[in-house]
Amino acid sequence: MLITIPEVFTPEEAESIRQRLDATEWLDGKVTAGYQSAKAKNNLQLAENHPLAIELGDLIVSRLTQHPLFMSAALPRKVFPPLFNRYESGQSFGFHIDNAVRSLSGSRERVRTDLSSTLFFTPPEDYDGGELIRHASNQIARGTYGAVSRHQPAQGHAGDPGGTHLIFLLDPEPDP
């Protein structure tokens, strides 16, 4: 299953969120990677306990749990707090499988993650790359569920995290 989740935010809200994210400090993304995926992960991430990550994470979870398509497709019992990632020129997250069990920061609670979601804040015309590529039947197939294109800001997708996949970004700088 792979679904597109439209209009999680208005374009204006997405732009405001993006500006706030652009103005904050980012860390090495390997911080939250499991042992295997740390070998493939080369991106930046907002610290899980960063006040902006908590504020925006709560807002995203609130919007998703009010979104009829997300709720009917995902049927979540729990929603793990979102992680905020960004990619600079030449960075990527090579072939990996998302962690099946995640630990909540500052807690002993562990959450099984049966669904992964990505929400976009940057217009696709402002960067090159960013496609999700899934690995199926020992072949690199663009989108086991069909091609997953880069989405408009305030859109996202959700799907099975179990297959190997990669995310790459060629050049995140806006075109002149």
Swiss-Prot record:
Give the enzyme class: oxidoreductase
Q: Which Gene3D superfamilies match?
A: q2cbj1_9rhob like domain (2.60.120.620)
Q: Which GO terms describe its molecular function?
A: 2-oxoglutarate-dependent dioxygenase activity; iron ion binding; L-ascorbic acid binding
| Cofactors named for this entry | Fe(2+); L-ascorbate
Annotated Fe2OG dioxygenase domain ranges read: 78-147
Q: Alphabetically list the UniProt keywords.
A: Dioxygenase, Oxidoreductase
Give the cofactor binding note. Binds 1 Fe(2+) ion per subunit.
- What EC numbers are recorded for this enzyme? 1.14.11.-
Q: Is Oxidoreductase set as a keyword in this record?
A: yes
GO terms under biological process: DNA damage response; intracellular iron ion homeostasis
Q: What is this protein called?
A: PKHD-type hydroxylase Mfla_0096
